[in-house]
Amino acid sequence: MIKTLSNIFKQDKEKFVIPRSVQQVIPIETIWSDGIFKIGRNKFTRTYKFTDINYAVASKVDKETMFLEYMDLLNSFDCGGTTKITINNRRLNKVDFEKAILIPMQEDGLDLYRKEYNNMLLDKATSSNSMVQEKYVTVSCYKKTIEEARTYFARVTTELNSHFARLGSKCAEVNGEDKLRILHDFYRTGEESGFHFDIQESMRKGHSFKDYICPDTFEFEKDYFRMGDRYGRVLFLREYASYIKDDMIAELTNMNRNLMLSIDVIPVPTDEAVQEVEKRLLGVETNITNWQRRQNANNNFSAVIPYDLEQQRKESKEFMDDLTTRDQRMMFGVLTMVHTAESKKQLDADTETLLTIGRKKLCQFSVLKFQQMDGLNTALPIGHRKIPAVRTLTSESVAVLMPFRVQEIMDAGGIYCGENAISHNLIMCNKEKLLNPNSFLLGVPGSGKSFNAKMQIVFLALATQDDILICDPEREYASLVEAMGGEVVRIAAGSRDHINAMDMVDGYGDGGDPVIEKSQFILSLFEQLDKKGINAKERSIIDRCVGEVYEEYQHGGAVPTLRVLREKFLEQEEPEAQDLALVSELFTNGSLDAFAHESNVDVNNRIMVYDILDLGKQLKTMGLLVITDAMLNRVTENWKQGKRTHIFLDEFHVVFENEYSGAFFNSAWRRFRKRNAFPTAITQNVEYLLDSVLASTMISNSEYIVMLNQAEPDRAKLATLLNISTEQMGYITNADAGCGLVKYGSSLVPFANRFPTNTRLYKLMTTKPGEDSINRGRM
């Protein structure tokens, strides 16, 4: 036997003690709060949790890259210990799940909509498999003291973080309480919310930590066990196929059942492995030589070497090539799996399903006989390996047992954004957890952009007290906002609602001189007035006059408006100033004076929609700029009060028609983030945006991007900008309404978002022709 394996078997060997209590079944001796467990004589373990990556929807090239990176991770495992990779399938606790996602009633006249929204969420949660898949790496080592173990695990932590980061996954240490919670949730399924453990309190009272996690009873039979009122069974992989597909683990763990699958890996030093293979190869060559000698003695000089001896020679040489030329490592592996059910009948049916999946992959799984307790302790992420059925493998062979499948997004306190198109689990996004909350909604007309935005608005209106501000160029949001108790501000030539383009609250700008910031904004407005734009002289005049208007206001002058600014132009001597006064006359004293009056809009309502449908083409871009500036003022006021603001800007591409308005929006985008505002830009003209360097930078720097069905040129540009694979592009090619891809931080997840059509909320949110009678009634 190889020295490494012999040593590990010797170190793992323990005196068998018949357990006299359920606590004694749990093979843990000592725990520390940082997550290190002592599970045997000088044997310490530590568990790490890692996140999933999009392996199932990756392109062939990307899959190969991920496979090689995962193989590098396996090769990095230390020979001095053993490593266990565990996939934990657990069903979400119904009570905790509902408490986390449902909106509480508030008796404010909107509970009717809350009930509809909650019913939709419950229907989605019931139809999905409600399973959470968690993935762990448990590293074991043999050290004399806890200090030595801590030093060892510190080095392992650094290596694991580095390798998982290259895979696109995140790896984090599991502390003592969380590791006990994993075991508690397995041992006491259905009682997840009842877990409470404080190590200091437990030590003070002299209680064993096992009392907090163990089930009420354990009964081990020949080929199954009972754990409390649940049944369980442990299987192991007895026979491996010659070629295993990389989706076998994904299929085994795709069952809608509580189960844990563990792969134990024992790496062997390369020099030992080469020595062992040379010894085996020498033995095969000796057998072939002896066989040939016997044939020659019988005067049979042309005999062909028997097939089995030829195969042994070929396989030994291939193994040697793997070790010496292909940077493979020899590893010993064992795959175990424990699954539980509510009845023996259900358990038997689930076992047969798992055995069938194995047979389909040409692998043979077997039930452990009279070893169910040892198998259970091997399958759990504790660090034990009590099943000796190890198989000799290479790094490549172990890497085929790929634990990755698809990324899930299920943040506490998140907004429902649809269902994962692959796993069918709910997608719950909490933008607070992202590096920045900036969002984009992109898609062709009819793909479901407005509906997606309205779903977010509904949740925010019903579940939070945050302010919601919407810029509505197509009058699509008014009926919904009024139903939610909000206010509609109609901005148009001749309208009674006015927004002063020169309003400026205390704290306006990026922290510099607010008058200079406002002057830049006024310059961007004047760029809209003439297709030729404004020249350097005119910019100087505008800058000077804006400064004078605000200076006079501080000394008791008139409230700054565009009319006051025009009068200031008329006072100047330069002919360019007179030209500016003439150009601005239409927008200050003429028929397009919507932004030249003092503001008379009530800003106390927390939900406001700015309806700019009737502004006309000449004022549309100016309207977007002025409303965004007004939103900035509101955001600044809310920020001072510690209040969050959500902003929705439709037809976003319009503002990038010239350099100044684009620069203003880029600046506003940064200020929103700094002042606790969550902006969302909505547009159908993706190609137009991506042609602007500023806009494409804004998109690439945004952490939350919803991509619905895209036109061909838009798809290609988005794929380049956001590194989307060909397979993932399929989810935004000829996609149904409400279906696509969501980029959430570093995750890229395909989703489907379908809302029940027989609800009041659907009628308020839809813009589909024939179903939008409420919105058409406002036109």
Question: What function would you assign to each model-found segment?
Answer:
Residues 449:
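Conserved lysine of the Walker
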Residues 1-404:
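Extended, folded cores of ATP/NTP-driven motor/assembly subunits in large transport
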Residues 485-489, 694-707:
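A short helix-turn-beta junction within AAA+ P-loop NTPase domains corresponding to the substrate/partner-engaging
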Residues 722-778:
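Conserved P-loop NTPase
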Residues 441:
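Hydrophobic anchor at the beta1->P-loop junction of P-loop NTPases
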Residues 459-469:
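Post-Walker A helix-loop "phosphate-sensing" segment adjacent to the P-loop in P-loop NTPases
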Residues 53, 60-79, 90, 253, ...:
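P-loop NTPase motor domains
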Residues 452:
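Hydrophobic positions on the alpha1 helix immediately C-terminal to the Walker A/P-loop
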